[in-house]
């Protein structure tokens, strides 16, 4: 299995997100202004040259600027010594149905964290669907708030991880 990761391939990421979040899971609002921001990093994963999954990471302040009603990440102990612009949000992690059960989501999560760290992140926060919390816990993320229903009524929880070695 030859795995390749790329950044900047929004059209491929959009295809995965449309299939997984809109067609499969029924979300109505999948794309936003964040997708168009130059500081938003779209990560795509390919297996043997075939599109398999995606994610995006971006500076936290971008979310507030794009949507005043977006869920707000809660403060946590990991925020200590993290300046404005050094907290990134990871989201839209998805793997196409035919490519699942191969550990690819873990690869995407790890690659996304590396991209955020390379862009200056010290802390990554994410608002994960409840059923995938174990995936992120295995990758070192800690739940920092109870489950909520702020994202189209679906159960999600905030998680965070320091990526600066602290």
Predicted regions and their residues:
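Conserved active-site tyrosine of GNAT-family acetyltransferases
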Residues: 17, 136, 141
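A short beta-loop-alpha structural element at the N-terminal edge
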Residues: 1-13
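Conserved catalytic-core motifs of GNAT/GCN5-like acyltransferases
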Residues: 125-127, 142-158
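Conserved GNAT acetyl-CoA-binding A-motif
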Residues: 109, 116-129
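Helix-loop element at the rim of GNAT/NAT acetyltransferase active sites that forms part
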Residues: 15-29
